[in-house]
Design a protein with these regions (language model features):
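Structural preference for solvent-exposed beta-strand-turn elements
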Residues: 1-324
Length: 324
């Protein structure tokens, strides 16, 4: 039976992170739990809902090896409310656990670990390494354009496409297309990662340039190894939108605008808009100038920004929220 002692901050970090992958409501009670497995002084903490899994291994002071599943919400709340210091986990009878810290003792019931699903393993597939900050950046700059309505489920994720030694990360929601390109030496292949997985990766990835993430995928599973966490994800299947038909279209209209100035200008238009009052924002390009104009029942905004543009006057309208 499992017995160990651990610093509150260490176990709380592992529990709250892996709990994000635990099911919030399932007919299988084990899926609502966090799986604890102790071997020596290494405690492996896992949350898994059959779609997303997060695993972490931390150092503890082990007394007796064992395995136990605990309700994720309950164990996180208990540990969070414990005072700082060492917490002792003591399974004194099968599926009966004491948690002790200073003069506080909680006694809770565990869940049969035999009901807990096994994390997927990749028999074969593709893998590549990428710095954690770079992976964080490409996800962060494309995730906003992932579809949120499941009319075509494969679009509810971002496509990672390696082609001609270049990594393209693409998100499409039917209105916007976001693409980020980076050099990556690898054979051609592609896969689609669900938005939920990408959101969790954003929280876990570091800004430390020295840290490297390993991405491994097969036909329908992906594994992301990042520092002290391993993220498991079912991949999305289906025909992704062929963005090359739009992005590859020739155009003789091109303008270069200062990003900060443009964002500040478009942000000002939001003062004239609300849930009931909606209006497009007009962009007019002419002679190295971009005119941004928006008029509603509340008022109007008219501003000019310097830009690099030459050619005939060109006007186009956008939803301001999609520009931001």
């Amino acid at each position: 039976m499992i017995k160990f002692s651990v610093q509150k901050n260490d176990i709380l970090d592992a529990l709250t992170t892996t709990a994000k992958a635990a099911s919030t409501k399932s007919v299988i009670s084990a899926l609502e739990g966090i799986h604890l497995s102790l071997t020596g002084n290494q405690l492996t903490v896992t949350g898994y809902d059959l779609e997303l899994g997060i695993k972490s291994t931390i150092d503890v002071e082990g007394e007796s090896d064992g395995v136990l599943v605990l309700n994720s919400r309950l164990i996180c709340d208990i540990v969070r409310k414990m005072p700082s210091g060492v917490i002792r986990f003591d399974e004194y009878e099968p599926l009966k656990l004491n948690l002790m810290c200073e003069d506080i003792t909680y006694s809770i019931m565990g869940i049969n670990s035999e009901e807990y699903p096994v994390l997927p393993e990749l028999s074969r597939g593709e893998s590549f390494e990428i710095s954690e900050p770079l992976l964080k950046s490409v996800i962060g700059q494309t995730l906003y354009a992932v579809a949120t309505i499941d009319t075509k489920p494969v679009l509810m994720g971002s496509k990672f496409e390696i082609k001609n030694n270049e990594l393209n990360v693409i998100s499409v929601d039917g209105i916007r297309i976001a693409i980020r390109k980076e050099s990556l030496l690898h054979e051609d292949f592609d896969f689609v990662v669900p938005a939920k997985t990408l959101s969790e990766l954003l929280r876990l990835l570091s800004d430390d340039e020295s840290k490297i993430a390993t991405v491994s995928v097969d036909r329908n599973q992906g594994i992301f190894s990042i520092d002290k966490y391993t993220v498991f994800s079912r991949l999305l299947e289906g025909d992704f939108f062929d963005y090359t038909k739009i992005i590859g279209m020739p155009s003789n209209i091109e303008a270069v605008v200062n990003v900060r100035e443009l964002m500040e200008c478009v942000d000002r238009t939001l003062l004239l808009l609300n849930d009931k009052i909606k209006s497009p924002v007009d962009f007019t390009f002419s002679d190295n100038t971009l005119r941004v104009f928006c008029e509603t029942a509340i008022g109007k905004l008219d501003q000019k920004i310097k830009c690099d543009y030459s050619g005939e006057e060109f006007r186009i309208s956008f939803n301001s929220r999609y520009i931001l």
